[in-house]
Amino acid sequence: MDYLWWIVLLIWTLIAPERGTVAQRSKSNVPRLKPSYKEMLESNNLLTFNGLANSSAYHTFLLDEERGRLFVGAKDHVLSFNLVDINMDQQLISWPSSPSRRDECKWAGKDVQKECANFIKVLQPFNQTHLYACGTGAFHPVCAHVEVGKRSEDNTFRLGSSFENGRGKSPYDPKLQTASMLIDGELYAGTSADFMGRDFAIFRTLGKHHPIRTEQHDSRWLNDPRFVSVHLIPESDNAEDDKIYLFFRENAIDGEQISKATHARIGQLCKNDFGGHRSLVNKWTTFLKARLVCSVPGLNGIDTHFDELQDVFLMSSKDPKNPIIYAVFTTSSNIFKGSAVCMYSMADIRRVFLGPYAHRDGPNYQWVPFLNRVPYPRPGTCPSKTFDGFESTKDFPDDVITFARSHPAMYNPVFPINNHPIIIKTDVDYQFTQIVVDRVEAEDGQYDVMFIGTDMGTVLKVVSIPRGTWHDLEEVLLEEMTVFREPTAITAMELSTKQQQLYLGSAIGVSQMPLHRCDVYGKACAECCLARDPYCAWDGSQCSRYFPTAKRRTRRQDIRNGDPLTQCSDLQHHDEADGEAGLLDKTVYGVENSSSFLECSPKSQRALIYWQFQRHGEDHKLEIKSDERVLGTEQGLLIRSLHQKDSGVYYCHAVEHGFIQTLLRLTLNVIPAEHLDDLLHRDPPDTNDPANGKMWYRDFLSLINPPSPNSVDQLCEQVWKRERKQRRQKANLLHASQSHTSQILHSSQSHAKWKLLQENKKGRNRRTHEMQRAPRSV
């Protein structure tokens, strides 16, 4: 068989699915749209800063809406970006470690490039004109003030001249996380406080008070924690009750788990805690912690836990005392890889902190609830001279301090709202790393739109929609967008409601993307409704940003059901007319008894594809059913063996939520097999010709990387034309070569005769003569 057709057969064998009926996989949990990095750039929906040549680790973000700037801490640098466009008006501060510090770090056995540098870990607003920044300082933490000016017009961005010791504010090791927040001139930070990375603590530094921290070397307080975030949440209208909440994960305390495990935690501190008088001096006296549970109940009573807390976002509500907490978790197991998002209410958290304390008791010294008398005031309560008469924690009785020291953990865990995650991902090749949430006003209510970063450089846009009640939520994955040029973990995310933009940080750079891309959903009312994006609605002419104003009553939107038949039924004929006008027409050719693949892929990954066939000269259309010869796939229609009766027009339709859209009209012409010899008539290929080997390789590459659906037809046509051209060129070259050789031979013979005649004339008296020989040209 001709080598080209062997290659065609090989390629179709590779791309064709297994024989038999292929069941449609569930599409409810896949993103409706999945644009690539290139598509995001080409659609002007992504701006990227690809990093500095001598820097990396763009992990620390500080969003300043008033100045319109995004401050980013990286390796040896602090950067300032314009919120409108991160590639416009960039500012840079270089803050490397001193050569002596780098040498000391190197002599300690640390990596010069990855560890012996100043990795910025803390960026907090200090006052109206300055930021407070801290870095690892090549394993010698250092802090300084950064002047940014009072207004953006000041165009000020410079590092202060005085530096402070960063111990208790920034970790020594750049691989360790730090959670920090600057409140009323005091810095609350969860970090490591020693060179070896073993002394983890929650610190309060700066301000007019003495620094304070958690108890040292006591695993009941902290057991090798990894801090995630710090938040101030008011407890009541009385400022004396304000509490600081810390989110972290740590190793389970002995006895909590049979094997070594990680638990997610929430910890609380009173803002007005100044330590004890005789015990716990300069140590927290109001520190309590509880386990955060995010699990899926099992049928056999064994729950599947997501214990690795990765990120936390607080969604503000009308009541500042009761924000909704969104938390991202991953699994600890190396076998089972998954991610989840759970929601928590402050009411449930406060109920746990008012519940029983964890206490070791019994013959096995296991953890049980403490049921004896609890000293007054209850440990964990903030001092208040208004209610309990204690002006400071230094006034607490000794039994309160002693109890607080030995009972920092609560017995009951905090369960998520509805006792179930709102999002679970276990069948994907990525894990969640970051989350931000935006509350969006839609036509039928408010929705929280989640933007979730992954460890593969993608962002998921997800909205939770109530099926019947708010206790039964449906996860709708709108988009999965690639926002970095290569797979890399997203380690920082900030959302600007003013600019309606999302900012993302990673080890290799910073990216910016809009919160909504309504124009990409399509040009029809039905496509806009099918998107179920709370940001978008059909305005009568296009899918555009939805604004909840009384003047725009013609907006069409259905987030809860996504039903285009109810929202756009009166526009169906208009959409169909537009669809017919913009329908893609293609013509392809196939050879009888060979294979052919008709490619058709819908924009929406949730759409189902079906095909119709119309013979030439007929009006009615027949639906194509998959069988042994014809196989429908998600990428198109594969006809294993073409017949003459397969010639005709093929229609590719996408069906989603009852809405049918025609994507492609394709005309297939089948060439009879008896014409094949005439079309492909040529000499057998010379396998010893190196040029022919190159043709084999080029033809093979063209087949395995087709530029278009009918690339095989185009390739065959190119090969036929090329071979005919080569035959003509070969014949012309042979004829020209023969003519040229005859001319040279004739000329050479004439020249030889003339030369011989001249030699005979000159050398008649010579005794010797040279041997006569033909010229080399002959």
UniProtKB/Swiss-Prot annotation:
Region (Disordered): 727-778
Protein name: Semaphorin-3ab
Keywords recorded for this protein, A-Z: Developmental protein, Differentiation, Disulfide bond, Glycoprotein, Immunoglobulin domain, Neurogenesis, Secreted, Signal
Segments forming domain Ig-like C2-type: 579-668
Pfam (any one): Sema
Signal sequence segment: 1-17
Gene Ontology molecular function: any one: chemorepellent activity
Principal place of residence: secreted
SUPFAM superfamilies, A to Z: Immunoglobulin, Plexin repeat, Sema domain
Source organism per UniProt: Danio rerio (Zebrafish)
Functional description taken from the UniProt entry: Might normally influence the midsegmental pathway choice of the ventrally extending motor axons by contributing to a repulsive domain in the posterior somite.
Expression sites (tissue/organ): Expressed in rhombomeres three and five, and in the posterior half of newly formed somites which is avoided by ventrally extending motor axons.
Glycosylation sites: 54, 127, 593
Gene Ontology process terms (BP): branching involved in blood vessel morphogenesis; branching morphogenesis of a nerve; morphogenesis of a branching structure; motor neuron axon guidance; negative chemotaxis; neural crest cell migration; positive regulation of cell migration; semaphorin-plexin signaling pathway
GO cellular component, one term: axon
Keyword Lyase: no
Name of the encoding gene: sema3ab
Disulphide connectivity of cysteines: 105-116, 134-143, 270-382, 294-342, 518-536, 652-716
Domain Sema positions: 32-515
